Amino acid sequence: IVISAETYDLEVAKACLAAGAKVLNLTGTAKSEAMYRLAAEHDAAVIVCYVAGENVREVSEIPIDHDPIPRMSEFFEREIELAAKCGLIRGFVDPGLGFYYDNLEDSSVRIKHQMKTFLNAFRLRKLGWPVCNALPHAFECFGEEVRSAEPFFSVLAALGKTDLLR
């Protein structure tokens, strides 16, 4: 069983890796270089999440582009290059669709953005790392059929050639 830890805090990452975690789900960029070095030292993988801010607790809005992939690609290119310089050999890119942003409170806007990103995730594979996507719940859209949300989004993610669903 592979244990993963979701964090942007370096001390939490150290504790989790020391306890046996083999995957860090990095939800911030402020300490990414140190995180990559730490993961490499522990022979762990890192899921690099796209975050429009220093970490997922300090964001307000995300750009709502007609095509979000170029913006995400630019971010991931920088992070992958830095990770490689730090000795990290295993990683995933994650468009970060599960994070809260002020301008995605309207469920129709958020779901449209998520669907567009899922369907175009295959374009991130050119960066050389597999793509990971978290599956939304979309409670306000699916209501009592909320259990249908993850299968719905997993189909879109599969069409977009997502490598890892969580």
Indicate where each model-derived feature is located.
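Active-site-adjacent loop and "lid" segments of alpha/beta metabolic enzymes
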Residues: I1-V2, L10, L17, V23-L38, ...
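Short acidic, glycine-rich surface-loop motifs adjacent to enzyme active sites
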Residues: G91-Y101
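CE4/NodB-like, metal-dependent polysaccharide N-deacetylase domain
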Residues: R71-F92
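Active-site loop-to-helix "anion-binding N-cap" substructures in soluble metabolic enzymes
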Residues: T7
